[in-house]
Structures are given as C-alpha cells and as structure tokens.
C-alpha cells in the first residue's frame, strides 16, 4: 500500500528535491538577466540586498537573486589566475544546477550529500554569501588548516569580488590577530580552532577586548560526518600542568612489563601444547583416535579457547584457526562456557590466566593469579595494597573513637589518612593505565613513535595527530611502555564536545559524500536532514563483489596477483589499508616481488600532497591508510581514463560503511571510469569480533581450496550486519557521551554567563555588593534556622563566621537581640561589610599618583583589581570543579554493579557539586575582595620619561594578599582537536602606570636590571 502511494506521490526526499528544482529554475532566470550588468552594477547588488534585508525582506526571498549573482561572478572570473597556496590556479568553474540545488539545501539547514568531484567547495559559496548579507557571523568549517587557507584564497575570491571580507583561521594565526579575522563576513577554519577560541574567550579572556568571537549564526561543516560523527566522542580540552603530580609510571612500568611477559609466555606454552596434540590427531586421521586421544584433543581445544582469552592475537592460535574444524571446536567451548550451568567452571578455567582480555569490548580484567603474581614476581614493586582501596569513612570513625588522641592529633591523623588514600588511588590508576597500554594499545595501529614522542593516529582518517594526547593518564602510560620521555601530567582547564559546540549555532548545515548511513543520528542529535544531491554526470564506477578468504596470507596473495595483472595494463592503483602496520606489511610484500610503489601513512604525512598528485598517473601503485580515503581528489593523467581509470582496492572492510564508501569514492570522479574491490579474510578484526557465530558452520561446508575466494550470499550479508552492529555500538557510545556532556554543558553555560557578566559590566561595584549580600544571606540561613530549636539560633556563630571571612569588626552582641528577624540580620551584616568594602576601594584608589591619572591611567584601579580577582577565582574554582566532575564520571560507572543507573547518579551528584561550587565561589570571591593591595612604583614621572619608556594605560594590576604572590596570566597554545597545553607566564610584580620590562635597565639610573632594583615589591 505504502509502496503504491510512494510511486504516485514520491518520497519526502523526492518532493523536497522537486521544490528546490523550481528554485534552481528561478536562479537561472535571474542569472540570464544579470549577464547584461556591468561589473560595478553586479558588485552593487551586495549593498542592495543588505538594504532590502534591512527593510524587512527575508533571506528566502533574496535567495534566487543572490545565488544568481554568485553564478554570474563565477562566469566573469573564468580564465582568471588566482594565487592559491603558493601556486597560481586558473579559474574555470561556474556552478551547475546540481550545485545550486546543494546550496539551496544547505541554506535550509540540511546536509547535502554530494559525490566525489561534484564541487562541494564551490557549492558552499552560495549559502555563505546569502547568509553573510545579514552581517552576522558566518563560518565554513573544514577538516584541516590547509583546506581552510586554500578555500579562503580560492573560492573566497568570489565573496571578495562582491565586497565581502573573508578570513582564514588556522593554528598559526596569533591570538592578537584572531579578532580581526572573526570580524570578517565569512571565516574559514577548522572545528578545533573555532572550539578552542570559544573556550579561551570564556575561560581565559581577562576583558571583553580579549574575546575574539562575535557569535554563532550560520555554519557549514565540510565533511560533516567526519566532524559531527567520527570526532564527536573527542572533546576539545584546554589543559595545563598539574602543580603536584603524583604519577608513578616510572616506578611501576617494569613490574607491569614483567606481568604481561608472564601472560604471553603462559599463552604461548598453552598454544604450543595444543598444537602438538592437534598435529598428532591430524597425522593419525579421524578413524584412529582412541578415547584418551579424544580427551587430549578436547583439552587442546579448551587450551586454545583459553589462549584466545589471554592473547587474542597469538600467532599459533591464528594459524590453527585457519582450519574451519578447529575454529568450530573452539567455538563449541565458547558456547559451553557461556551456558548458565557452566559459569562457575568458566570462572575456574579463566583463573589459570594472569589477566583476561576482552578485545571486542576493549577491556581487560586481572585475575587472582595475576594479582598474586603482581605481588610475588615484580621485585618488590607490587604490593597487596595496590588493589585494596581504603574506606575513608571507616578510618575516620576509628580516629574519632580513639580516646588517646586529642583534637589536634585527630585532625592530623585524618589528613594523613586522606593523603594515603589519594596516593593509593593514584598508584592504582597508574597501574590500570599501564596494563591498558600494554594489553589494548598497539604501536603503528593506535599510535606511532615520531621524534621520540608518542603521536596518536586518528582511527577514522589515519592521520597523525601531533600534540593531541590520550586522556586520563593513558598517554603517559604508553610513553612509559615505549621507553620515551614521560611528559608532565595535565589537568583540564576548559572543555567542550564538538556536539555541544555546534549545537550553539542558530543555523547549521553540512556537506559530505557519505551521510545517508548516519541520517538518523544527524536528525536525532543535530536536527539535520540529509538530502542526496544527484550527480552532474552519470557515475561510471564499477564496484566488484568482495573477495573473501580464510586467512590473511591468502588475502595478501590474492591482492598481489590482482595488482600484478592490473599494473601490466598500466592502470593506476590505490590500495587502502586500515593501519600503518598493514600498509608497511603490504609494502614489504611488494618490494619482495619487485613492484615499485609509494606508501602514504601517518609516518609520511608530510608528503601527502605530493603522493596524491602522483597517484592518478599511468602505472602508479599507491598504498595508503585512510588518509587517502577522505577529502583527497585524485586526478587522472591524460590517457589513463582510456585504460579504465583508477583501480581502488580495499584490504579489509572497515568498521564503518562510510569509510568504505569514502575509499570507493576516490575513483570515477566527475564521470571518469574506475573500479573498486574489497579483499576480506576471516582474520580481519571486523569478522573476528563482530560477525555471526553461524559463519563457522558455513565455512565447514563451503571451505574452498587454498587461495580460492569464498562465494556465499550469507557471508556478504553477515559482513554488512557486522558493520551495522559496530555502527550501532559507536552511536550508543556517542549518545552516551552527549548525555553526560549535556549535564556539564548546562553548568558550563552558567559559569561562562557569570564570567561574561563580570567582564561586560561597566561598574563592577554593584556586582561586588550583590555578591556580598548573597554571601551574608547564605551564612544567615546556616546559623538562624529556628528560635525554638536548641542551637537553631546562633548569633555568636554567625558573628565568628563573618569575622573569619571579612576584616570587619562586629560587636559581641551585634546580632544578639530578641526583636531581630533573619532578614534584618542579613541586611545589618551586609551593610557593614559593604561599607568596609567601599572604604577599601576608596583607600586603594587613592594610591594612584595624580600625575599618572593625568597621563591616562585609570583613577579606579581597585575596580580593575576586583574584576580580575573575580575572574581569577571563577577560573580557578571552575578548574577544580572540572577535576571533581572527572572523578565523579569515573566513579559512577561502578554503580551499575549495584543495579543503579550511572547517568541518573551522575546527574544527581553533579547537581550537588555545582550547587556547592556556586556557594563556595561567591564566598571565596567575597573574601578575596578584601585581600589585595595596589602598590605604586617609587620612580618619579621625570625618571620614567627620561628612560624613553612606552606608556601603557589601563594596566592597573594588584597584589593578591590572600595567595601572597602576584597574579599569573595563562595562555593556551592549541595544536590539536583533543588537548592543548597552558603555559604559565612568570609572575611579575604588580605596578600602576607605565610598564618596564623586567630585564630592562631600571629607570632610576642605578644601572641594574629593573627586576633586581625598583621592581622588588614587598607584600605587606
């Protein structure tokens, strides 16, 4: 019934395309009219459109004319030489109808799925121009700095021709230049640069002038699935060094390496013993087995099952599992042990190992044998206490019940217990991360070693991520494992996920070649529809059926054979691999067989542009990781299309169908011919971990001769099912991340709003007074609950609390009056503290010499000091809160064992923590406002002028007496999408008036450096 209606009325997708096609026709009509306009008349359209918008017209009404203007400009640029990335390129592009169609979809907040070579970059110019007419911020998000710079210089020419300004936001742009770039009508940049600038504006800027961004109106995300799907689980983090790091990786690494070696040796022995029995059985034949041998055979298969749990990548195990009968026998043991009645026996069997590795779940578990070995065989490194956490509550009770201790001794003992508990937890955490580094993180798959540093490999793109670090101490654990220098521990200063960052935009859209498989996720999380845009020319690519082999060895032999045959015809070949390790293995095979080739992986990423430029040439063979699978445009050398075009081979099916489609899309661009084929083995991770167990029975029936591919419809379906299973798992993880970050996001918005209010308000004094009043009110609520309850009305306690917070004197019976209500008490306290604050401000302001005020120095430095104190306290306590939230996130995962929902627990406790932060923040800000002092320099104005110093106004600084050190500024140096490091500037003495460099000669004429002379400021 529904199919019949669909044929009559078309799908929603078809109806939308038809509606947009009518708009394309309007665009073309206007384009015809505009061809008669002069250049000046065409350029004047921008001002005309802006005026019409101001007069009430809507963007949708302007769309046909605006898009037609862009199309007309592109036509007039034909033949123009444009300088792009150091080279001159000739403009030869005018948008096709399908590109106009994609531009309409993006303006309407959809994701345009456009095939390789269909001109996504030019398509984006039309909606960028239209939305930039509003004067609001318009951003084009790219996947790397090179594309941001290139697109700004290349297609940005159209926007500049029409009078708009453009800017390229790359990692190399200095902080002081960024505000100017953000003032541009259209800004090109990477997601990480936009995200880090947002974090810096809201967590590091000390004034409104320091903030660079101007809002979030419209964004188009290039390769939107890569950024919003693949990168969604990777938060942007600005981090800095931990002042008191407790890391023990150096101390523990030898012991962990020994434990892992013992596990490996144990599994190798088990596998070797099993192989001997299996070979003996095979030599005798199935008809000559006695009962004892049959028992030995079953025991051998049990050992192999155990080896799979201890070292899943064991070479002996992998070789034996090439035989479908042995694979089936091992699977039988797996089914046996998963039966409910055999759970206890399974536990006893696994206890033979030191540790159990769950390769599919990417987890591990230490057994009792492993714990005992850690204590016994690690040369005194291991300790029983490494796996026993203290119960601080019980320990505190014991201290309180110890009558031999006085109050001071009890407090000291509790501090000692707290310190010991923190040390134990840190040691246990370091131990867990070292084990994870050894058991679950693989060199040349998850990371490479470059310049004696650990460099992460992006699992989706295959590109190296220099500067990015694994979080939670894992990166340091890998550094310890590989014997490179262990970098300092860091803590989070500010963080946000890309999901929540991009959801701040008023309008969001995107473009990619592969989005339909994730359409539901785009709709559910980002409210974005996916629209497939037809191709300009028919796609001539031929996708061959997959070739499936039993073993990797057979698969590689088949690839070698196919490469030789295709190479003889001089067709270019691109071979896509999943990891650096596989690309290097294939390279060795090709070298041994005399095939000249080029390798592109994370170790050769500097040569990417050069290698891709050569990949479309006659007889070229290119082995590449996923780096060549997205965003690269391989152009064919003249004559290659006649040979059949580029031949793309995949060495495995990836866990995501989008990655496979991206690899296929490297060939047959813009109507060129091309072929693609995937080669798969049952040793590939996808099939080994996620394929249906029924495959084993199929293999036993259809096992082909050595070297022959397996052909069975069920296998192809099973591969697709496995991919869907992985995609669903990853989607669940991304959604899980978002649910937790949504809690953080609400808190982040509250803190950043409070911080921006402090920065934006002209006069900080009313804000300071409001904070003092709220603190006095919070204290009153604590000490004045009820007159009828014993201890419920405590005026003396309130007075002592106020004296502890503020340097203000309250008479002994100031609040101890029968007629006073709590509101009156609050007001009395607040009035007295506010009066003291005003006196403090007036006193500090009076310290500024009159001649400095005449030179332009602020007459109210105390206001600046208070503002800076508020900002610094907010930042400091927010950073501490983030650390507590990280710990909470780790802790709540264990609540699932007690049948409690971790997310619900997280929300509940996160709210309590934030409520505590809000109260403590106001209290600390109120306290700190009385603990600063303005210190003016002793030099005379004449001395300063004689020294020829440059005068800087509005630089009033202060000494924070509470911390007994000058304030510090911190600057972020972001290099990556995941982590950025904070550098702390050395603290400088705080002065009012013109600044003198610390290493400059002192203007007093002593001949000494300023830092050794008059710059010495004592804090009284």
Swiss-Prot record:
Job description of the protein: Part of the Sec protein translocase complex. Interacts with the SecYEG preprotein conducting channel. Has a central role in coupling the hydrolysis of ATP to the transfer of proteins into and across the cell membrane, serving as an ATP-driven molecular motor driving the stepwise translocation of polypeptide chains across the membrane.
GO cellular component: cell envelope Sec protein transport complex; cytosol; plasma membrane
Domain of life assignment: Bacteria
Annotated positions binding ATP: 99, 117-121, 633
GO MF term list: ATP binding; metal ion binding; protein-exporting ATPase activity
GO annotation (BP), single: protein targeting
EC number of this enzyme: 7.4.2.8
Cofactor names: Zn(2+)
Protein name: Protein translocase subunit SecA
Keywords attached to this entry: ATP-binding, Cell inner membrane, Cell membrane, Cytoplasm, Membrane, Metal-binding, Nucleotide-binding, Protein transport, Translocase, Translocation, Transport, Zinc
InterPro entries on file: Helicase_ATP-bd (IPR014001), Helicase_C-like (IPR001650), P-loop_NTPase (IPR027417), SEC_C_motif (IPR004027), SecA (IPR000185), SecA_CS (IPR020937), SecA_DEAD (IPR011115), SecA_motor_DEAD (IPR014018)
Basic and acidic residues bias: start-end ranges: 978-987
The protein's assembly and partners: Monomer and homodimer. Part of the essential Sec protein translocation apparatus which comprises SecA, SecYEG and auxiliary proteins SecDF. Other proteins may also be involved.
Keyword field contains Cell inner membrane: yes
Compartments, record wording: Cell inner membrane; Cytoplasm
Region (Disordered): 963-992
Transmembrane intervals: none
Cofactor note: May bind 1 zinc ion per subunit.
Natural source organism: Protochlamydia amoebophila (strain UWE25)
Reactions that this protein is recorded to catalyse: ATP + H2O + cellular proteinSide 1 = ADP + phosphate + cellular proteinSide 2
Membrane topology: Peripheral membrane protein
